[in-house]
């Protein structure tokens, strides 16, 4: 099976399309990519972000869909509204089994990675073609417009994000206080909880990229979202635990 990563290119390899495709491969899925931006970065910080011209992104998408039977799509960094619109218009007309959106608003070092106009377009239109959206707590706060301090807040926010049009919402709770990272899935009917201990002293980059890609890969394998998230949760927990300090800054998950 073939999955498509639509995301930024991180030249340090810790996040973005390189991390997505490594994750796909780990689970036996062949990965192809459409690059939305070049992020000049290392393990310490993002130095600069160069969005790919929207017309080029459109041609990348055309080349992939003309040739490959894409079974699932994972979307990460979109950079700006113009790129988001190109991706939206293309995916709206294609038949894929599953679309996962891991909304990327800021880098781990605090750099803006999606314009305000892009965020508004994501909320008003883009989210409607998404099967699963996987924000962390800060991203979820932007999407639902409310502060999140507890699991009850997470559930309320998940319902609000669902009402924007996503078919299911997974809010990652790693930013909340406590010894456990508790993620909440809402599918419009029920809430599901996925829990794992936080790994002290480990703060690798690319966790959102790898987690969402692992969910997509396992959904394509089993067609069971609950099972896919559970498998991905176990995998990301081990990947964080085994992450390595390859540079001078944040760890990298080397699996």
From Swiss-Prot:
Keywords: ATP-binding, Kinase, Nucleotide-binding, Thiamine biosynthesis, Transferase
Name of the protein this chain belongs to: Hydroxymethylpyrimidine/phosphomethylpyrimidine kinase
Gene Ontology terms, MF aspect: ATP binding; hydroxymethylpyrimidine kinase activity; phosphomethylpyrimidine kinase activity
Protein source organism: Aquifex aeolicus (strain VF5)
EC code(s) of this entry: 2.7.1.49, 2.7.4.7
Catalytic activity: 4-amino-5-hydroxymethyl-2-methylpyrimidine + ATP = 4-amino-2-methyl-5-(phosphooxymethyl)pyrimidine + ADP + H(+); 4-amino-2-methyl-5-(phosphooxymethyl)pyrimidine + ATP = 4-amino-2-methyl-5-(diphosphooxymethyl)pyrimidine + ADP
Pathway: Cofactor biosynthesis; thiamine diphosphate biosynthesis; 4-amino-2-methyl-5-diphosphomethylpyrimidine from 5-amino-1-(5-phospho-D-ribosyl)imidazole: step 2/3; Cofactor biosynthesis; thiamine diphosphate biosynthesis; 4-amino-2-methyl-5-diphosphomethylpyrimidine from 5-amino-1-(5-phospho-D-ribosyl)imidazole: step 3/3
Stated role: Catalyzes the phosphorylation of hydroxymethylpyrimidine phosphate (HMP-P) to HMP-PP, and of HMP to HMP-P.
Binding site for 4-amino-5-hydroxymethyl-2-methylpyrimidine: 41
GO cellular component: cytosol
Example of a GO biological process term: thiamine biosynthetic process
Family according to the record: Belongs to the ThiD family.
